[in-house]
Regions:
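Acidic, low-complexity/disordered tracts enriched in E/D and polar residues
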Residues: 2-78, 133-140, 163, 400-505, ...
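Conserved SAM/SAH cofactor-binding pocket of Class I
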Residues: 169, 177-262, 268
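Long, charge-rich, low-complexity alpha-helical segments
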Residues: 75-120, 126-137, 184, 196, ...
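Mobile active-site "lid"/loop adjacent to the S-adenosyl-L-methionine
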Residues: 262-293
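SAM-dependent Rossmann-like transferase core, predominantly class I methyltransferases
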Residues: 116-119, 127-195, 200-202, 208
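Short "lid" loop at the C-terminus of a central beta-strand within the Rossmann-like core
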Residues: 250, 267, 284, 313-318, ...
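Flexible, glycine-/basic-rich loop-and-beta segments that form/coincide
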Residues: 349-441
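Conserved Class I SAM-dependent methyltransferase catalytic core
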Residues: 221-222, 287-343
Length: 552
């Protein structure tokens, strides 16, 4: 177990008092213009980029120069020094920056603590009298765009490695991270009556779900995480979220939801003494068993037609089918549900171990890093694991409409069951992938309910982000390769032959697929039935991928 000190306690026991203080804090943050854009303007693009890499020196130098020039920091700079850079600031300057909350209010909330006499930048007073304060929690702005527009929140979490100066504690509550932003971007923006956020952490998934859901139940195994999640909900004025303590689906036994979203603690961690068990990423199971458990149990907690979206890892084991092993295992776990699993990355076990040891704040080149590295590799070797996949999982419980789709065409043909490896760069998705996923699901359901005769009668248009590429050898009139490229979504590139290229090019919403196929058969001097048998499945695929859309 970790020997790091426990995180600072959250000191406000009375919720009404905490709500009052958080309201004052909100007013102060607005007054200081404590926003992403203002911070980047304060210290510049280079320093902002360095902060994203975990380096604060460039930003600190900018603020140090400002202090030398002006003698004291303005409100925005004070908050930036304190909460973003993790350095102590004079109590008097923080009092000005938090005029409504006050320093005592910030201490009562657990945001800051007394850093001791004369620690941090001086305020011009006697060194024996001057006092400074230091952040006890991380607080920073978070800006995003989704299908409903752009918005900005403030996110409270535990201090990160940069501010702590040492490895994280096991009870650490993570703030905005790559995984939480990925999941938030994947969420379907379609309205939902009741949503479950499984493993909410500091509350970011639940907050995003509030953009499209009437009611949300957010659970976590960490009581501290739920306390911080409540702070974030109140600070940002978000209602309709119920917080429950417990592991996985235990807090919602017997309940069903229209939507489940989850960034579960899926990181594969050795189950041996001395390896830190971080609440925010370690579910306490062996290997990828936690992801399997979430996928298998989701069925019982989804309403008919309900959808679950989660992130996860899966193991590739030697002698178990090579590339078919990891992703196919996920397909087996999801067999009771319609599913769309997209693998985005595969790491060798050495890369995986390095990533997550470093994530906890243990520095490479130290004896502790090497000890943990051995533990990870021993654990993988014991199960014959060679690589680890990471990706997105979308699950859907069948409803009456799904049954109708299955009976409208060949048995099972209308069922969503996709396992994909899409390891390349994504397309441009300013509002996240969620809107693209929602469109693909809707179009899939529509085409899956049509037999080939009905599909041939349908009219399509090419999606607005799709372009065609043709490659030529110098001097040749005929292309050597043709590609259909998706600008948004997953940035797919589909190889085209002459027939499919011509069909896509003619799909302007005026002619049916059948009419286009008939004209092409005459032009290419081929059998119309054979050409239709070749092109209609390709049309279904392009519809599923979001590259062709129904014209009406």
């Amino acid at each position: 177990m970790s020997t790091e000190p426990k995180p600072s306690p959250l000191t406000v026991a009375d919720e009404a008092r905490a709500d009052e203080l958080l309201g004052r804090l909100r007013d102060d943050l607005v007054a200081a213009d404590f926003t992403v854009a203002a911070l980047e303007s304060l210290w510049g693009e280079d320093a902002a980029a360095a902060l994203h890499r975990g380096e604060r020196v460039p930003a600190r130098r900018v603020l140090d120069a400002r202090r030398r020039e002006h003698g004291a920091s303005a409100g925005l700079a004070t908050l930036a020094e304190l909460f973003v850079l993790g350095v102590a600031v004079p109590r008097g300057e923080l009092s000005e920056a938090l005029a409504r909350l006050g320093v005592d209010g910030a201490i009562e909330l657990g945001l800051v603590g007394d850093a001791g006499a004369a620690e941090g930048a001086g305020d011009g007073g006697d060194s024996g009298v001057a006092t400074s304060v230091r952040a006890r929690l991380d607080l920073r702005p978070y800006a995003f765009s989704d299908a409903y527009g752009s918005a900005e929140w403030w996110i409270i979490s535990d201090l990160g490695e940069l501010a702590l100066g040492h490895a994280l504690g096991e009870q650490h509550v993570l703030g905005v991270g790559g995984a939480s932003m990925t999941l938030s971007g994947l969420m379907l923006p379609t309205p939902a009556r009741r949503v479950l956020d499984l493993g909410t952490g500091c509350g970011i998934p639940a907050m995003h779900a509030s953009r499209f859901a009437d009611r949300i139940v957010a659970t976590d195994i960490s009581e501290r995480a739920l306390e911080i999640a409540r702070l974030n909900l109140v600070l940002n004025g978000i209602d309709g979220v119920e917080l429950r303590l417990g592991s996985l689906f235990e807090p919602v036994a017997g309940e069903r939801f229209d939507r489940i979203v989850s960034n579960p603690p899926f990181v594969i961690t050795p189950r041996i003494e001395g390896v830190p068990e971080y609440d925010y990423r370690d579910g306490g199971m062996v290997g990828d068993a936690l992801v399997e458990a979430v996928i298998r149990e989701a069925h019982d907690h989804l309403e008919p037609g309900g959808i679950a979206q989660l992130l996860g890892n899966w193991e590739y084991r030697e002698g178990a089918g090579g590339d078919a092993d990891g992703l196919e295992r996920v397909g087996d776990w999801a067999a009771a549900l319609e599913h769309w699993v997209i693998e985005r990355e595969v790491q060798h076990v050495t890369e995986y171990a390095e990533t997550w040891i470093r994530d906890g704040g243990t520095k490479p080149g130290t004896a502790e890093f090497d000890r943990l590295y051995d533990a990870w590799l021993d654990d993988f070797a014991a199960r014959g694991v060679e690589r680890v996949g990471f990706g997105y999982v979308l699950l859907r419980r069948a409803d009456a409409a799904a049954s109708a789709r299955s009976t409208a065409v060949a048995a099972g043909a209308g069922r969503l069951a996709r396992l994909e490896r899409l390891h390349g760069p994504l397309g441009a998705n300013e509002a996240g992938l969620g809107a693209h996923l929602a469109e693909c699901l809707a179009e899939h359901d529509r085409q899956a309910g049509l037999d080939d005769t009905a599909l041939a009668a349908a009219r399509f248009t090419t999606a607005g982000d799709v372009t065609e590429e043709r490659h030529y050898w110098p001097g040749d009139d005929d292309p050597t390769a043709m590609l259909l490229r998706q600008g948004g979504g997953f940035g797919r590139a589909i190889s085209l032959d002459t027939g499919l290229a011509a069909l896509v090019g003619a799909s302007d919403g005026e002619l049916s697929v059948g009419a286009i196929v008939a004209a092409l058969a005459q032009l290419l001097e081929v059998d119309e039935t054979a050409l239709a048998a070749e092109l209609l499945p390709a049309v279904r695929t392009l519809v599923d991928d979001g590259m062709l859309r129904f014209a009406d």
